[in-house]
Design a protein with these regions (language model features):
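N-terminal amphipathic alpha-helix/helix-capping segment at the start of soluble metabolic enzymes
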Residues: 33-53
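Active-site entrance/lid segments in N-terminal catalytic domains of soluble metabolic enzymes
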Residues: 2-5, 12-31, 36, 56-58, ...
Length: 294
């Protein structure tokens, strides 16, 4: 298996789906697709038909993987994290395999191994594909799923041109070349759905998750979240690393489950966000979100 990922042109991607589904009823190898029941849950002014979805990880970097996850029943997509370091520079820093789970799981992956512009294109391709596939194949409501951005890992990088352009493009894809390309391809392949395709919303994402590396200080986390809430007006999640549980709790839990041979020290537990700092920080952030109507 190649260590490098190669995005598939959108027309080729859609022809693959159409041919495979017509031939054997599969969608990228998913034999039995989930068909929504009509029920849905509210989130950020949108609806999701199931409360499940792939977290931001290597599995969600390419459009075809997002489509496959949707076919299997996922409806909330936290797409892979982007940051100022990307592409070959990032890939060179990630040990292989980046996730090893023969027994316990070891995770050394980081953010997207594509370039940030490539990542945005993949997510917009997946968004447009799912809008049409959900309707044409009857998988569910075209408005029954949500894309959630993930960004890291410092405010300077997030405000920089590369990541800022990504955020703006995900919030409004109407001026991106890939959004126009996707709509033209879809109208060619599904001419009976032209009016629906023309009406596909360019608002790919209205929410964001703040991903924090080990050691990101609480004040930096709060600055990032505050910026995304007040300046970008995005519904905002903040990921807390498992280290917030404390070293003793983590050690005791693993030991009780038979994983006493796994070795780790207290360094990250001491350097990461502490519970005592997290609680008042989230209270302040919630108050800020309330004041911004989020």
């Amino acid at each position: 298996m190649s260590e490098k990922m190669y995005p598939i042109p959108f027309k080729s991607l859609m022809n693959w789906v159409i041919t495979e589904y017509a031939g054997c009823g599969d969608v990228f190898g998913v034999h039995k697709q989930y068909h929504a029941t009509g029920k849905s849950l509210p989130i950020f002014g949108e609806r999701i038909e199931t409360p499940f979805g792939p977290a931001a990880g290597p599995n969600g970097q390419l459009a075809q993987n997002i489509i496959a996850a949707y076919a299997a029943g996922a409806r909330f997509f936290e797409v892979k994290t982007v940051q100022k370091m990307d592409g070959a520079d990032l890939a060179a820093c990630v040990p292989r395999p980046c996730i090893l789970a023969n027994d316990e799981g070891y995770n050394q992956e980081w953010s997207t191994e594509l370039t940030v512009p490539q990542a945005m294109d993949e997510y917009i391709k997946a968004w447009c594909a799912l809008k049409v596939l959900s309707k044409v194949y009857g998988f569910g409501d075209p408005d029954g799923f949500v894309f959630n951005m993930s960004v890291g890992y410092d405010l300077e990088g997030i405000k920089g041109e590369k990541v800022n352009t990504y955020i703006d493009g995900m919030m409004d894809a109407s001026r991106t070349a890939i959004f126009g390309e996707c709509k033209e391809v879809l109208k060619e392949l599904f001419p009976q759905e032209t009016a629906f395709i023309d009406a596909i919303s360019p608002r790919v994402s209205r929410s964001v998750t703040v991903s924090t590396l080990h050691g990101c200080p609480p004040d930096e986390i709060e600055r990032i979240a505050s910026y995304l809430i007040s300046e970008k007006h995005l519904h905002t999640f903040v990921k807390c690393n498992p280290t917030i549980l404390g070293y003793q709790t983590a050690r005791r839990t693993l030991d009780s489950m038979g994983y006493d041979y796994i070795v780790f020290d207290e360094h990250h537990f001491n350097e990461d966000l502490q519970w005592a700092d997290a609680v008042p920080m989230f209270e302040r952030l919630q108050a800020l979100a309330d004041s911004c109507g989020l």
